[in-house]
Amino acid sequence: MANDVRAADTPREVKAGREQQPREPVTDPALNIDVHPGGQGPPPRHRLVTIGDSLTHGFQSGAVFHTDLSYPAIIADELGWGGHFRYPCYPGYGGLPLNIELLLRELEDRFGQDLDWWETPLALFQARRFMDGAEDYWERGPGAIGPRTTGINHNLSVYGWDLRDVLERTAKTCRDALQAPKDNWLQQVVENHGDRAALRVLPSDSVDGNGRLTLLDAAQRLGNERDDGQEHGIETLIVFLGANNALQAVTQLKVVWSGEGYKDLRGKCSYTVWTPQHFREELEELAERVREIKARHVIWCTVPHVTIAPLARGVAGKTEPGSRYFPYYTRPWISDRDFNPLLHPHLTGQQAEDVDRAIDLYNDAITDQVREARKDGRDWYLMDTAGLLDRLASRRYIEDPLARPTWWQPYPLPPQLQALSPEPNSHFLASDGTRRTDGGLFSLDGVHPTTIGYGILAQELITIMRRAGVEFRHADGSVRPDPVTVDFSRLIRRDTLINQPPGNLTSGLGVLAWAEPTLSLVQRTLYFRAC
């Protein structure tokens, strides 16, 4: 098959791990290594700084928009520091690059919950007009004018960025990539949208006159902004990177292992999965840079298994009883009955397993970095995001007891989420026209969390921060007692996909089945590597 062409290039250490049990999650963030608490006295000036990709940027439903509901912003609110936490904003046309939720609501307002065949031409026209408006706003309108800030953002995250991007990309490289935009009616996508998004994250000219600061440089500057007598300028630094070193295998349904030029900003663009060795080499560079940042506590997050995301849905039943994998993975709007491997894009079950195995090796490397740092006396911690998502994986484990590893236990959702009907799960979101009937943890792009999903991430990180001795405060400044919990009631109210999903997103996902071949939504919203 076409997508098996590079199967011979599968790294030897990945092949050696086939048929092994999945990696067991780390349950002790300190890795059973005691370290003297990283600093005493009042908290440093910058209580929270994050370095990451789309999962930290606040991306959902194909766009970065509600950055005030990213998991870093949620944590900052619970810290009692929300009014000081600086993050980029994308206020127009549902954000960048294309807000699928807003598009579906536009179509629902015009055509109702069901799109009849005779309405298809008008619906196509309406959708293209919406996309043209977004293109005009960000390329030639108010969105084309970047903000001038007087300080460095605390959320230093850019969707689509992998380890190499964080090591090397700057405002200058992003500006150099921008071209004179063209108003193309057929290819309606905001040109260079990733660079435009990054320019709202990176320090502006008023802070960085020559535009040569990387995200790591920016974090280092924050770490150097120390009050008298303090060793650190940052209290907690969260590093959550690596998903984009494997995610394109799922978004493109194609496995191309990294090779020559993988450290080059342009040369790496043809690869969809990094070999574990290449990942380790770049991770070592990243960890060295993080060691230079003056942060009291550092939390590293592991890479989630991207094949669990519902954008790639397993079809044709599990390969055998007790297997974690399906024979094929394709788009969620293609039914088992309709799927044809000769016609439809897909990954094979073996490819999905190989990608997961590579991610397990990435996570072993991240764990090793934390372990060595703790042995050196640094107050570093591990947040095992991969294990968290594994415990929420509906089709892989929850609905198939035979596939569960011996260590597996279901993740206990917070009481406010358990009270929802139906209880949120990792299926693709669906509604009956009036209410949510399935899913709830993943947004409409099938990869990124909903607002409540980001709340779960925030809660796990808050628990680690409390273990590190970080104080969370009420609005009046008083210290919050343990356990410190996220205000999920607030997040539910803000999460429109939970409390009022688009009425045209019915269980068959017919509107997406129409929109994807017609509008190329996945390509427009998730082929967003910085290249």
Q: Language-model features: where?
A:
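Helix-enriched interaction subdomains in cytosolic or periplasmic regions
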Residues: 1-23
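Conserved SGNH/GDSL esterase-like catalytic core that processes O-acyl groups on lipids
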Residues: 17, 21-25, 58-282, 478-531
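Active-site-proximal beta-strand/loop segments in catalytic clefts of secreted hydrolases
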Residues: 51-53, 239-244, 301-305, 385-388, ...
